């Protein structure tokens, strides 16, 4: 009996120790981050992505073209009102909320996203990454866009190319077998710096290029080869029963990230699903995020989406800052939440926030990032137009930079 009791006590101790090792993160919003007002009467617009660098600086990709006429009165000559002017496209903040650098925007370079396109929203700046050397990489999601690499101060270093013709040229039809151009621009990419590779999600596939822009490999949903990906429109998403059992990716693929154990996580927004692969494209696992949410709506990102968002649940993700990255945080711009899932099992563990305009709430959350102390940063598009900071309240105080940064 005493042996059984001892074994039971040991098992309970191990369970408690494991729970204490990676407790569910608890956050509180910092309503005073970033520090306001910004200089020059600047105002932040839609924020599709943000990233933290090796110094825990937060790089925000802002969409100046999203500004409304009643917001930019100070930009006219003479000024109509005291405020405001759209902030530049690239904003660097420290963890205290101080603005450190700012640059970029429409016309900044010949290859800047959505060059010559005036309309706001989807046809604009879309992704930002910062490498270990401090270089800033930016892509856009309009016809003819690509990736450009800059110094931290905004000097153009390199252009990825692989551009389709810009409007008014007709947009090329979907072709998941060709790897030369990106007809709809480049929504999202990530950098494997050790291998010097660029991972791009596009249409129904993941494509990998080297740092010279040469294609290396690619795959579709569940790791199928590019040759087996269909080029047909994706069927409607059915929320009446279980999640759809679909092998192919369902656009939009809205992010790609690497975990600490070298796996590739793909945000399949069209199926409310995360698919996980090895870096060679072998399928590992998948899990759904609030699968009853409508997705694949034709008006996603368009005029009707203000009335009924049909974009799905997975806009972006980041991983918890514990050594094993036990949790994955998923930004859901349709339900306006951050879902917390167990990274390895895919099980739902909790959530942060809800719909609203107050601090700690969201309207169309699109961007999410984490620093080495486990604090979260978020950005919102549509009329949300802001960034927020959420402070980890139950961390161990250890600094853990992202392994690939």
Where in this protein do the model-derived segments appear?
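Bacterial N-terminal signal peptides
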Residues: 6-15
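Positively charged n-region of N-terminal signal peptides that target proteins for export
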Residues: 1-5
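Eukaryotic scaffold repeat domains enriched in small/polar residues
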Residues: 19-405
């Amino acid at each position: 009996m005493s042996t059984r009791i001892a074994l039971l006590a040991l098992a309970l101790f191990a369970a408690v120790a494991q729970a204490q090792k990676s407790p569910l993160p608890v956050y509180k919003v910092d309503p005073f981050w970033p520090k306001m007002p910004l200089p020059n009467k600047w105002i932040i617009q839609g924020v599709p992505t943000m990233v933290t660098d090796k110094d825990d600086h937060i790089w925000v990709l802002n969409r100046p073209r999203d500004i409304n006429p009643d917001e930019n009165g100070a930009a006219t000559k003479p000024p109509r009102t005291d405020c405001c002017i759209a902030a530049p496209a690239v904003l660097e903040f420290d963890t205290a909320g101080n603005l450190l650098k700012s640059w970029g925007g429409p016309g900044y370079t010949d290859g800047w996203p959505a060059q010559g396109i005036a309309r706001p929203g989807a046809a604009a700046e879309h992704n930002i990454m910062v490498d270990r050397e401090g270089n800033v990489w930016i892509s856009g999601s309009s016809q003819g866009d690509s990736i450009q690499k800059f110094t931290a101060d905004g000097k153009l270093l390199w252009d990825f190319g692989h551009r389709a013709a810009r409007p008014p040229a007709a947009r090329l039809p979907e072709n998941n077998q060709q790897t030369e151009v990106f007809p709809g621009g480049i929504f999202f990419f990530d950098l494997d710096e050790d291998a010097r590779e660029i991972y791009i999600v596009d249409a129904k596939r993941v494509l990998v290029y080297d740092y010279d822009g040469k294609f290396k490999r690619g795959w579709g949903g569940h790791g199928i080869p590019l040759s087996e990906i269909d080029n047909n429109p994706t069927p409607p998403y059915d929320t009446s029963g279980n999640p759809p059992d679909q092998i192919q990716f369902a656009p939009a693929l809205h992010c790609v990230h690497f975990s600490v154990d070298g796996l590739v996580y793909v945000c399949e927004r069209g199926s409310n699903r995360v698919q996980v692969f090895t870096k060679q494209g072998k399928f590992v696992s998948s899990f759904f995020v609030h699968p009853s949410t409508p997705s694949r709506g034709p008006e996603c990102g368009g005029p009707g989406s203000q009335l009924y968002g049909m974009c799905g649940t997975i806009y972006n993700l980041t991983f918890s800052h514990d050594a094993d990255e036990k949790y994955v945080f998923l930004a859901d711009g349709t339900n306006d939440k951050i879902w917390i899932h167990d990274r390895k099992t895919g099980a739902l563990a909790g959530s942060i926030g809800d719909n609203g305009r107050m601090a700690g709430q969201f309207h169309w959350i699109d961007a999410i990032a984490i620093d080495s102390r486990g604090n979260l940063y978020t950005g919102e598009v549509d009329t949300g137009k802001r960034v927020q900071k959420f402070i980890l309240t139950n961390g161990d105080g250890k600094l853990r930079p992202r392994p690939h940064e």
